[in-house]
């Protein structure tokens, strides 16, 4: 595995790979690799001849009161995991390499990014869209894999690729969960034993929605309210939002229609750690 830190060097490498007709897959991360990331690498390995992993803690997607400086950066361990997983190139640029002095251009997102995470974290998705665009232009992949845990982010990236005619196929990969149902996340390391146990309420909320929809309920807002109360009833947790949206545009859905496609989105705090989860439902 080769570690590359300069964008120009990465671009030169992928140019040669493309000339040699190598199918390139990329997995973008902020490091602190976990089983979810490793599953993305494994899937990329099965689909592409060359796998690039990017590690970049993007300052432009963190708000002023968020955990940018606290975000875990175990680079040596990440590199070891990446090599063992079969990564060919690890691209780990510095913030100065991605955003050099005088950097001015940003990608502005649209309606799909306005609600939920976009409302709670102003500017977050513009930061995501900007860095994803840059990393796609630098790594020039044929396929790029992203986890479905960040469902709204995936929707933003899909819209970005369509709107800008970027020549890459975006693949969403299923959420990887711990044995207790908690969605795997780099931030889970901050959870105490008690908080980790309470945080399973997010998955229990999803199972509640699954049960109610299977029984024929259509009042999505009512189900969301029940899940919000479940979270509020946990001693270590408090809800941020619980909402059903139309899966194609992330607009709020109050009532389920026949043959509708919806996504339940949950954000909550366990202590000071913000967690998200989701599931897609077809009625």
From Swiss-Prot:
<protein>
    <recommendedName>
        <fullName>Pantothenate synthetase</fullName>
        <ecNumber>6.3.2.1</ecNumber>
    </recommendedName>
</protein>
<comment type="pathway">
    <text>Cofactor biosynthesis; (R)-pantothenate biosynthesis; (R)-pantothenate from (R)-pantoate and beta-alanine: step 1/1.</text>
</comment>
<feature type="binding site">
    <location>
        <position position="153"/>
    </location>
    <ligand>
        <name>(R)-pantoate</name>
    </ligand>
</feature>
<dbReference type="InterPro" id="IPR004821">
    <property type="entry name" value="Cyt_trans-like"/>
</dbReference>
<keyword id="KW-0067">ATP-binding</keyword>
<feature type="binding site">
    <location>
        <position position="61"/>
    </location>
    <ligand>
        <name>(R)-pantoate</name>
    </ligand>
</feature>
<dbReference type="GO" id="GO:0015940">
    <property type="term" value="P:pantothenate biosynthetic process"/>
</dbReference>
<feature type="binding site">
    <location>
        <begin position="30"/>
        <end position="37"/>
    </location>
    <ligand>
        <name>ATP</name>
    </ligand>
</feature>
<keyword id="KW-0547">Nucleotide-binding</keyword>
<keyword id="KW-0566">Pantothenate biosynthesis</keyword>
<feature type="active site" description="Proton donor">
    <location>
        <position position="37"/>
    </location>
</feature>
<feature type="binding site">
    <location>
        <position position="61"/>
    </location>
    <ligand>
        <name>beta-alanine</name>
    </ligand>
</feature>
<dbReference type="Pfam" id="PF02569">
    <property type="entry name" value="Pantoate_ligase"/>
</dbReference>
<dbReference type="InterPro" id="IPR042176">
    <property type="entry name" value="Pantoate_ligase_C"/>
</dbReference>
<dbReference type="InterPro" id="IPR003721">
    <property type="entry name" value="Pantoate_ligase"/>
</dbReference>
<comment type="function">
    <text>Catalyzes the condensation of pantoate with beta-alanine in an ATP-dependent reaction via a pantoyl-adenylate intermediate.</text>
</comment>
<feature type="binding site">
    <location>
        <position position="176"/>
    </location>
    <ligand>
        <name>ATP</name>
    </ligand>
</feature>
<comment type="subunit">
    <text>Homodimer.</text>
</comment>
<feature type="binding site">
    <location>
        <begin position="147"/>
        <end position="150"/>
    </location>
    <ligand>
        <name>ATP</name>
    </ligand>
</feature>
<dbReference type="GO" id="GO:0005829">
    <property type="term" value="C:cytosol"/>
</dbReference>
<dbReference type="GO" id="GO:0004592">
    <property type="term" value="F:pantoate-beta-alanine ligase activity"/>
</dbReference>
<keyword id="KW-0436">Ligase</keyword>
<feature type="binding site">
    <location>
        <begin position="184"/>
        <end position="187"/>
    </location>
    <ligand>
        <name>ATP</name>
    </ligand>
</feature>
<dbReference type="GO" id="GO:0005524">
    <property type="term" value="F:ATP binding"/>
</dbReference>
<keyword id="KW-0963">Cytoplasm</keyword>
<dbReference type="InterPro" id="IPR014729">
    <property type="entry name" value="Rossmann-like_a/b/a_fold"/>
</dbReference>
<comment type="similarity">
    <text>Belongs to the pantothenate synthetase family.</text>
</comment>
């Amino acid at each position: 595995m080769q570690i590359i830190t300069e964008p120009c060097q990465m671009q030169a490498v992928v140019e040669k790979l493309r000339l040699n007709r190598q199918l390139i897959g990329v997995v973008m991360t902020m490091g602190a690799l976990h089983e979810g990331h490793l599953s993305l690498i494994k899937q990329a390995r099965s689909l592409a001849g060359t796998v690039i992993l990017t590690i970049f803690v993007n300052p432009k997607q963190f708000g002023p009161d968020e955990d940018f400086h606290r975000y875990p950066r175990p680079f040596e361990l990440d590199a070891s995991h990446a090599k063992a997983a079969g990564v060919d190139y690890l691209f780990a640029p510095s913030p100065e390499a991605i955003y050099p002095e005088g950097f001015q251009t940003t990608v502005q997102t649209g309606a799909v990014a306005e609600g939920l995470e976009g409302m709670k974290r102003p500017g977050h998705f513009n930061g995501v869209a900007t860095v994803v665009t840059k990393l796609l232009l630098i790594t020039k992949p044929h396929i790029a894999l992203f986890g479905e845990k960040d469902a709204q982010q995936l929707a933003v990236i899909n819209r970005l690729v369509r709107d800008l005619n970027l020549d890459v196929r975006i693949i969403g990969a299923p959420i990887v969960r711990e044995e207790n149902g908690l969605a795997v996340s780099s931030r889970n390391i901050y959870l105490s034993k008690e908080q980790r146990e309470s945080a399973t309420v997010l998955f229990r909320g999803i199972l509640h929605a699954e049960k109610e929809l299977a029984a024929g309920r259509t009042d999505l807002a009512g189900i969301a309210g029940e899940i919000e109360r479940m979270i509020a009833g946990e001693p270590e947790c408090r809800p941020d939002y619980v909402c059903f949206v139309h899966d194609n545009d992330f607009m709020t859905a109050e009532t389920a229609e026949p043959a509708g496609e919806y996504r339940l989105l949950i954000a909550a705090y366990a202590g000071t750690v913000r967690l998200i989860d989701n599931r897609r439902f077809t009625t």
